[in-house]
From Swiss-Prot:
It is a multi-pass membrane protein. It is found in: Plastid, Chloroplast thylakoid membrane. The keyword Plastid applies. The lineage of its organism: Eukaryota, Viridiplantae, Streptophyta, Embryophyta, Tracheophyta. The chain crosses the membrane at residues 22-42, 57-77. GO terms for biological process: photosynthesis. This is Photosystem I assembly protein Ycf4. The gene is ycf4. InterPro entries: PSI_Ycf4_assembly. Seems to be required for the assembly of the photosystem I complex. It comes from Lactuca sativa. Pfam families: Ycf4.
Length: 184
């Protein structure tokens, strides 16, 4: 949901707080917890989970491997939960024709570069570019070519826009910024 007036266009960017990330984090957490409990129950020789009798799983080597997978899965799951809680990748793109400035803001991982803030003059924008890669994993990305800076992506690579939606978005942005469109 973008906010747009005659002179200012603000485009919010979704970060890590997507439904798919929540689903993967929950599935990974529950699966790795299950692996860890099965490995622990094979070590203790008692049934911590009633689905698998501990006598059928020998601790060496199956129990050790399942415990390792459980611990590794918990680490990956905690990484996913941290990116979700920090909302990594979220932010906004602000195009201000009145002041002639484009601001791109994104949240990153905690640390020195937690806030990523880029600022350009509109007169330095050469074009709005659509890059299309067809095939099994088709991908369409919208870029902004900045003189002396190169191309800056404006859409995420995991956003699946239809060709019409991507063309519409590029045309609206190019019209707003008064720059040409390039397609690669």
């Amino acid at each position: 949901m973008s906010c747009r007036s005659e002179h200012i266009w603000i485009e919010p960017i979704t970060g890590a707080r997507k439904t798919s990330n929540f689903c993967w984090a929950v599935i990974l957490f529950l699966g790795s917890l299950g692996f860890l409990l099965v490995g622990t129950s094979s070590y203790l020789g008692r049934n911590l989970i009633s689905l698998f009798p501990s006598q059928e799983i020998v601790f060496f080597p199956q129990g050790i491997v399942m415990s390792f997978y459980g611990i590794a899965g918990l680490f990956i799951s905690s990484y996913l939960w941290c990116t979700i809680s920090w909302n990594v990748g979220s932010g906004y793109d602000r195009f201000d024709r009145k002041d002639g400035i484009v601001c791109i803001f994104r949240w990153g991982f905690p640390g020195k570069n937690r806030r990523v803030f880029l600022q350009f003059l509109i007169k330095d924008i050469q074009s709005v570019r659509i890059e299309v890669k067809e095939g099994i994993y088709a991908r369409r990305v919208l870029y902004m070519d900045i003189r002396g800076q190169g191309a800056i992506p404006l859409t995420r690579t995991d956003e699946n826009f239809t060709p019409r939606e991507m063309e519409q978005k590029a045309a609206e942005l190019a019209y707003f910024l008064r720059v040409p469109i390039e397609v690669f």
